[in-house]
């Protein structure tokens, strides 16, 4: 509410049109309210008065309601970096990632400790023959031979001096002949060793030899026949072991001469005779080939066991002489 002096001033300064040309005049008797304002109409053609002085500043009003938020101001300059905070607790493990690319070859590792001793290996191939040693002394005289047929009478000779001289001469000749025979035997023995080395084995009077060729059964049989021999036909464990050593040396399974081409299930020698020795692997012969063909021929493994196979298969050729 405006103070009283200011209200009077405003009323006095209002235009005549605003206040109206007529105003009611009240007597003092009717002004019973001390706050009643009495306004007098200005005389006609009167001059406008000066503006009154500003009134005193009124008391401070109550705080109004908050206005709406203003528009955001421009972004300020970036402040200095703060100090690094202390390390937070570890987070929970993330999901398993995809496998990375394959790494390169690493540096060689440290040598490991020696392993345990391995199993005993198979018997190696025979070593080369040694140099021929010096001739040994003559052996003891053998038993006398059978008596020969009586010869034709010779011409009568001159009278000898003594019979003792003739006997000594004959004894010396016999000793010389025995030494020559021993020398020839040593030469034959060394020659036999040279022939067998490195691809041959001898058992008794048999010799088993291979040239390393690999052929079908019929071609292998033909090759041995042309060499005046036949495919290996072991008839004892010693002969079977000799053939096995050649198989190990070449690291290839080999053909044996026996087959059951004439009668299924009955293996015989090339001469037609029945086997007097065999060394079949467990479950053999089974006559079951991979392509369902007949297994009429025989091979020997590196362990000495036998197995029946198809005759068209190619195996190592070992001939017997």
Swiss-Prot record:
Location in or out of the cell: Secreted
Record's keyword terms, sorted: Calcium, Collagen, Disulfide bond, Hydroxylation, Lectin, Mannose-binding, Repeat, Secreted, Signal
Annotated segments matching region Disordered: 43-163
GO cellular component: collagen trimer; extracellular space; multivesicular body
Pfam families in UniProt: Collagen, Lectin_C, Surfac_D-trimer
Compositional bias per record (Basic and acidic residues), positions renumbered to this chain: 47-65, 147-159
Extent of the signal sequence: 1-20
Superkingdom, taxonomy of origin: Eukaryota
MF-aspect GO terms: D-mannose binding
Expressing tissues: Liver specific.
Ranges annotated as biased composition (Gly residues): 100-109, 124-133
Single GO biological process annotation from the record: positive regulation of phagocytosis
InterPro entries per record: C-type_lectin-like (IPR001304), C-type_lectin-like/link_sf (IPR016186), C-type_lectin_CS (IPR018378), Ca-dependent_lectin (IPR051077), Collagen (IPR008160), CTDL_fold (IPR016187), Surfac_D-trimer (IPR015097)
Disulfide topology: 224-319, 297-311
Family listed: Belongs to the SFTPD family.
Binding partners and assembly: Oligomeric complex of 4 set of homotrimers.
Described purpose of this protein according to its UniProt entry: Lectin that binds to various sugars: mannose = ManNAc > fucose > GlcNAc > glucose = maltose > galactose > lactose > GalNAc. Could play a role in immune defense.
Name recorded for this polypeptide: Collectin-43
Organism: Bos taurus (Bovine)
Gene designation per UniProt: CL43
């Amino acid at each position: 509410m405006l103070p009283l002096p200011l209200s009077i001033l405003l009323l006095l300064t209002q235009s005549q049109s605003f206040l109206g040309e007529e105003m009611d005049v009240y007597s003092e008797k009717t002004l019973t309210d001390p706050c009643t304002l009495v306004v007098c109409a200005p005389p006609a053609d009167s001059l406008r008065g000066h503006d009154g002085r500003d009134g005193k500043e009124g008391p401070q009003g109550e705080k109004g309601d908050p206005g709406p938020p203003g528009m955001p101001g421009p972004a300020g300059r970036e402040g200095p970096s703060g100090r690094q905070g202390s390390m937070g607790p570890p987070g929970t493990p993330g999901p398993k990632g995809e496998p990375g690319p394959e790494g390169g070859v690493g540096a060689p590792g440290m040598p490991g400790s020696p392993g345990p001793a391995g199993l005993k290996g198979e018997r190696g191939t025979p070593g080369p023959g040694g140099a021929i040693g010096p001739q040994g002394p003559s052996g003891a005289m053998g038993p006398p031979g059978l008596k020969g047929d009586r010869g034709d009478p010779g011409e009568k000779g001159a009278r000898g001096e003594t019979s003792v001289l003739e006997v000594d001469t004959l004894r010396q000749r016999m000793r010389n002949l025995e030494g020559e025979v021993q020398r020839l035997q040593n030469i034959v023995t060394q020659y036999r060793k040279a022939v067998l080395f490195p691809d041959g084995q001898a058992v008794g009077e048999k010799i088993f030899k291979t040239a390393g060729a690999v052929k079908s059964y019929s071609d292998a049989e033909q090759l041995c026949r042309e060499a005046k021999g036949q495919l290996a036909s072991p008839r004892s464990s010693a002969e079977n072991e000799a053939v096995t050593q050649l198989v190990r040396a070449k690291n290839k399974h080999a053909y044996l001469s026996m087959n059951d081409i004439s009668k299924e299930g009955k293996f015989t020698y090339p001469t037609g005779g029945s086997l007097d020795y065999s060394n079949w692997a467990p479950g053999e012969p089974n006559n079951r080939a991979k392509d369902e063909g007949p297994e009429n021929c025989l091979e020997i493994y590196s362990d000495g066991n036998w197995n029946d196979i198809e005759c068209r298969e190619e195996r190592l050729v070992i001939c017997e002489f």
